[in-house]
Amino acid sequence: MSQPFAKYHGLGNDFILLETDASPLPHHLVRALCDRHLGIGADGILLVSPHPEADARMIVHNADGSRPEMCGNGLRCVAFHVAARLHRTPTSVALAIATDAGIKRCLVEIDPPSPEAHVRIDLGPTTPPVTKTIPIPQAALDLLTTSVGNPHAVLFHPPVDLPFHEVAPLLATHPSFPLGTNVSFATPTQDGFAVRVWERGVGPTLACGTAACAVAAAAIHAGHAAFDRPQTLHLPGGPLTVTITSDGNAILEGPARHVFDGTLAAF
C-alpha cells in the first residue's frame, strides 16, 4: 500500500512527516526510511494523526527507531503542516498539538505559498537544572542537567581540545543517564551561545529545539542570562530564540520549512 509523505526541516534538522495512525512504527522501517543512502534520509519521522483534545497529535521516531518524548524542531514542522492544511491565506494560526510530553500551544505565522513559516511554541516548564559531575576517560566534566519534556545535559565553556564527536556520545550513553540524554556544548558569543548538539538516538544534528531551551534554562541557572529575556542560540543550522519565563516555561521560536512531497511505494 502506498503512503504519501512530506519532507520538512527546522534549521536543517530534517524529518519525514506521515499522516497516519500507524504507531509505533517498526524500528527497521524507521531506520530504512531515515537512511540517507538507501532511503529518503532524515533525522527522524513525524507521525501526525487526529486527537480529541487538540488540533493534531504528534509522535516522533528518531533515526534509530527510538521514540523521544519531545522534539522542538519536529513540533514546529508539524504545526506548520497542520496550519498550512487549514489555511490558504497569510495569517497567524493558534494551534494545540498533543505530544508524549503533553499538549503544546503553537502560534504559526504562515504566508502561502511560501515554503517557510515562523513558529512560536510554549514547551511548558523546564526542570530546575542540577549539576552532575560525569567522569569519562578525557576528564571529569561538570554538566547542568535539565528536562524540557526530554532529558538534556549542558556543558558550558567546553575546552577547545575536547573532541565533541568523541566525548558527546560517551556522555549521552553514560550510566549516570539510564535512559540516555541529549548533550549540548555551549560557548558564549556576543549575543548568546554557540551550541553543538548530540541528539539521543540520532547523533550530531544541525539544530535541536529542546536543546536550545535546555541551554537557555541552564544559562539562567549559571548566571549567564535572566528570566523573561530572549536568548539567541546559534546552532550549526542557524539561530533559535528562547525565552525562559519567570515561572520556568520555555518559549521556543524559529523557522520550519516544507521541502517536498512524495509517495512511499510500499508502506
Predicted regions and their residues:
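Active-site-proximal beta-strand elements of phosphoester/diester hydrolases
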Residues: 120-122, 142-145, 196, 253
